[in-house]
Amino acid sequence: MSSVTTPAPVYTWTADEAIKFLKEWNFSLGIILLFITIILQFGYTSRSMFVYVIKMIILWLMWPLTIILTIFNCVYALNNVYLGFSIVFTIVAIIMWIVYFVNSIRLFIRTGSWWSFNPETNNLMCIDMKGRMYVRPIIEDYHTLTVTIIRGHLYMQGIKLGTGYSLSDLPAYVTVAKVSHLLTYKRGFLDKIGDTSGFAVYVKSKVGNYRLPSTQKGSGMDTALLRNNI
């Protein structure tokens, strides 16, 4: 005798159960969304590097979570229309995830900085201070960059980089590394304010797929490729 396979029961979520779920988890979901909103709203490198790193982690997790959800939708599609859209969304998400990694690796090869994997931007400003390369992300490749020294503290575009520097330590050039090319900024103006403070303005002077010679004698490395990044 042939056995008859009993179909698996189909569970449906009623409106009352959905309302009960929201009532039970509403407070926790509200706290989580409030936390994420605060991080995304106030996560800037010029304000708090710690908060900015948390923001980057949240943004970085968005793509794998999106891919997981789209795959889940493919497995448990309601009908063929939903299945088709889910497959398209999954392919798009995976392609964009791969493109992100490819661009990040290319930028990492150019700069040697882990900031290359920043999901927010592919622009990394680089400044060589007495042989030490500082690399930080910026949203845009501005026409001018401002470097400020306040009582020995070094700031670039408002982002604190280090201490123990003077105006005489500022280089003639700074760069902004992108995935496909390098932007060079030449120092166009320098003004001293007091004995230990001042600022310099760097103006975009050259754009191309090239590298600058290192300021470290005998190092054989390029300015945008120094490995002692901070």
Swiss-Prot record:
Question: What does the record say about its membrane topology?
Answer: Multi-pass membrane protein
Asked if Protein biosynthesis is a keyword of the record, the answer is no
Q: Where are the transmembrane segments?
A: 25-45, 56-76, 85-105
Identify the keywords attached in UniProt to this record, alphabetized.
Glycoprotein, Host Golgi apparatus, Host membrane, Host-virus interaction, Membrane, Transmembrane, Transmembrane helix, Viral envelope protein, Viral immunoevasion, Viral matrix protein, Virion
Gene Ontology MF terms: structural constituent of virion
Alphabetized PROSITE patterns for the sequence: COV_M (PS51927)
Q: What does this protein do?
A: Component of the viral envelope that plays a central role in virus morphogenesis and assembly via its interactions with other viral proteins.
Protein family according to the UniProt entry: Belongs to the betacoronaviruses M protein family.
Subunit and partners: Homomultimer. Interacts with envelope E protein in the budding compartment of the host cell, which is located between endoplasmic reticulum and the Golgi complex. Forms a complex with HE and S proteins. Interacts with nucleocapsid N protein. This interaction probably participates in RNA packaging into the virus.
Specify the protein name: Membrane protein
Organismal lineage: Viruses, Riboviria, Orthornavirae, Pisuviricota, Pisoniviricetes
